[in-house]
A protein has these predicted regions:
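Short, positively charged and aromatic/hydrophobic N-terminal segments
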Residues: 4, 8-12
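Positively charged, amphipathic and often flexible ligand-engagement surfaces
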Residues: 11-243
């Protein structure tokens, strides 16, 4: 089955200065709440004081999580679970806006956490397979691996210890599992670009996955941060490899 017979893509000319379209789904209350929130977080002093108060409140076990979820979290996140995101997905879809579910958990250090994150990423791919308003899936490799190990793996002259090599093999297995699921369900998946000093190993894995799963349709996508001075040449080299 061709990717393009299952999913329909349209080229739409957008005018980003047309706020009537951009904020069509938002009520005046939503817009006023967002305005106040952005005014508050634009102040370094307020942010610094607020962070200290938040940590203090958490130590005292005060119920601040509810407040955070109804303010800052609500502004920037669709939900804590896939099901919580469903109303937003439906609302955006009604106006022709697609959603990409991005499970943004990073900084973990235990293998069990990485495996759990992998399973949740796969759940987002399964959701995208059954939801017409989710055209792509995405994942960050820093969510399924130790950052320090990615740093070492990107420095080719550094030899890894046996335990580190084993951990690296587990990372590769997780990436393969995610991309294989995307291929089987015919869901395009982005491998998110990360910090420049760990990007080399991520690019290597992305290329391997593209070679493996993009033989019939385009399933695996690498992403490129074009503000980097070296990325245009990298993009050209990718094009040559693709040809």
């Amino acid at each position: 089955n061709s990717l393009y017979t299952k999913r329909h893509y349209f080229c739409i000319v957008l005018n980003f200065e047309n706020t009537k379209i951009a904020f069509k789904l938002k009520s005046n209350l939503d817009l006023n709440r967002a305005y106040v929130l952005f005014k508050v977080i634009s102040s370094p002093i307020i942010v610094k004081i607020g962070k200290g108060l938040m940590l203090f409140a958490l130590k005292l076990r005060l119920p601040v999580s509810f407040i955070v979820k109804k303010t800052i979290f609500k502004q920037f996140c669709g939900g804590e679970t896939i099901s919580e995101c469903s109303p937003t997905i439906k609302s955006l879809g009604s106006q022709g806006v697609g959603t990409i579910l991005d499970y943004s958990v990073e900084g973990k250090t235990h293998e069990d956490d990485f495996d759990k994150t992998t399973d949740i990423i796969i759940d987002t791919i399964v959701k995208a397979h059954t939801e017409k308003n989710i055209p792509f899936a995405v994942f960050k490799i820093t969510g399924i691996s130790k950052f320090s190990l990615l740093e070492k793996a990107s420095q080719k002259e550094i030899n890894l210890h046996e335990s580190e090599a084993n951990e690296l093999a587990k990372i590769e297995a997780r990436i393969l599992k995610i991309c294989k699921t995307a291929h089987e369900l015919n869901v395009p998946v982005f491998i998110d670009a990360e910090e420049s000093w760990i990007q080399d190993v991520i690019d290597t894995w992305a290329f391997q996955m593209m070679c493996l799963f993009n033989k019939e349709n385009t399933i695996v996508y690498n992403t490129i941060q074009m503000y980097r001075h070296d990325r245009l040449e990298f993009l050209k080299s990718c094009l040559q490899k693709a040809l």
